[in-house]
């Protein structure tokens, strides 16, 4: 396992649409292991492969230590997709390892049904609610080039982007 560098806004790679994983290979499993190690070191509860500059549809997540979640163990999700969502919404304060030290309330569907492939190559469907639903939607957004700040007001988003663009120009790195 190896730590990987987490890319930070305004890095344009974060806006890429990640490509599907064709086969669950040793390379994909190694990437997942690296992502878990990187996520724990950061520390965070979820990480999309694009955040470590790998534009493939892979997410790692561990909500075990968080209250209000239905995910009971660390998990990797390959080619995840939301196949249905509740009309009822939930608001959670979200943060992101690619947008350090910034948090905002985001409204998302309270429950979602997801389809994904696990690290053994099995295609699964599962219901997610609470923090699990919020986190999986946040990470799937990353795979589609969408950041959580895209769900907040234009004014707040512009302020956040400006702050990170100025920091990048001055060579300030957030870690």
From Swiss-Prot:
Keyword field: Hydrolase, Iron, Metal-binding, Protein biosynthesis
Cofactor binding description: Binds 1 Fe(2+) ion.
Reactions this protein catalyses: N-terminal N-formyl-L-methionyl-[peptide] + H2O = N-terminal L-methionyl-[peptide] + formate
Cofactor: Fe(2+)
Enzyme class: hydrolase
Record-stated family: Belongs to the polypeptide deformylase family.
Protein name: Peptide deformylase
Provenance organism: Rhodopseudomonas palustris (strain BisB18)
Organism taxonomic ancestry: Bacteria, Pseudomonadati, Pseudomonadota, Alphaproteobacteria, Hyphomicrobiales
């Amino acid at each position: 396992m190896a730590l990987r560098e987490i890319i930070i806004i305004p890095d344009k790679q974060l806006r890429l649409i990640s490509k599907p994983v064709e086969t669950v290979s040793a390379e994909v499993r190694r990437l997942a292991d690296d992502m878990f190690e990187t996520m724990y070191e950061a520390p965070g509860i979820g990480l999309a492969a694009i955040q470590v500059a790998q534009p493939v549809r892979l997410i790692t997540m561990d909500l075990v230590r968080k209250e209000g979640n239905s995910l009971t163990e660390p998990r990797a999700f390959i080619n995840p997709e939301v196949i249905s969502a509740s009309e009822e919404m939930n608001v959670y304060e979200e943060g992101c390892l690619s947008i350090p030290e910034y948090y905002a309330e985001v409204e998302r569907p309270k429950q979602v049904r997801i389809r994904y492939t696990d690290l053994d190559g099995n295609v699964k469907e599962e219901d997610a609610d609470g923090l699990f639903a919020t986190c999986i939607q946040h990470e799937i957004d990353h795979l589609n080039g969408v950041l959580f700040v895209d769900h907040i007001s234009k004014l707040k988003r512009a302020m956040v982007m400006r702050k990170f663009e100025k920091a990048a120009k001055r060579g300030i790195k957030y870690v």
